[in-house]
Amino acid sequence: KIEMVNAPLQALNEVCLLWQIDVDELWTRDQLIRMREMFLAEPERTAAFYWCHFFVGEDLAISTRHCYAQRPEKEWLRTWRYRPGMIWFSHAPPWLSLPGPKGWSIVSEAHAFSHAETEAAGLVFQHYAYATEEQVAFKERYYGYHGAVAEWERLNQARHAPLRLGDYLHWVQDETRVDRLDRLGIVPLARRDPATGEWRFAH
């Protein structure tokens, strides 16, 4: 994966913002514009960390922090001020590195926007990581989460919330809680059409 993520950098010959946006991560246009404005206003900033709304079902998301999928020491670093010559030293964690007189340094270790700063600006993205059965089936195969689909179905059939995620998904070993989107005040950016089963952007 290192070769894959480094390949596009060869085409970047000027200072710019570099974003990692996975296929299951949704942002709004206004969020991207706002983050750009913040980087322009503070030229010394090097990167940005974010919180996310982490979906574990069509209508369920994680409600706690400093837990599974919400560990601020490594999640979620998604934006960097890229300068020509930088390279990826690691894909996971995403370490973009800069050459210097004393060797290579990790860009995000100095002057990054914190989770609190980006959240205060409304920059919390929506991560549809386990929103559909198809996603869970893939992760069951890819990560070896035996029985993941059955566990996920039981989680999403539960009638009461909040719930302890580890009581349903066996690979979650901490006290992570999940709750309904409406109880969390989350307005989803994508919804499944109950008639067709197709997912559509809501905005």
Model regions and ranges:
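Active-site nucleotide-sugar/metal-binding loop of Leloir-type enzymes
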Residues: 2-17
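Short beta-strand-to-loop acidic/aromatic patch adjacent to the donor-nucleotide binding site
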Residues: 15-26
